[in-house]
């Protein structure tokens, strides 16, 4: 288990100016407020962070800005989310270059494959950047595939995955994942994307949470 990654890790909102540029002043204010509130890490370029709407150059600018503001005070997770494996690997290598603490990737989407393709996808990402802990982002509402718990635990046991960011809203499946992970020796750090019933996720066995509302008020988490 990636024990260094636990607790509250908000999915950072990327503030933009009226002209669509990164608002670095507001960004610094937001990140510093969350760090001062005691968060355990930050997740940039997730669903809340404009990742699906950012060019490669914009992604790089966002990562650089976050790394400069955070300045090593907390771990920074970087979303490397794209339609297919080679593009994800390009983002992952750039995240490594810019100082990411961990990377987060969904399964491939748009051109949908089966479980063998999904497994190979995560293996290839890990092989490309083995130094960076890799978290699987389970968000079926966006990628139209639910990641099976058995596959996730298997990849955790083999050292491919360090953890899971669960945004499936499937509380039953999450409970089974927690149980299977525990039986396997807890190879995965399990982070819930729940924010309203995050207490229930913790009681079920989550190692941490990724609550979007923490961008507004982090102390409650």
Language model: regions and residue ranges:
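Active-site beta->alpha loop and helix N-cap motifs at the rims of alpha/beta catalytic domains
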Residues: 2-146
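Catalytic alpha/beta core domains of metabolic enzymes, predominantly
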Residues: 124, 128, 140-221
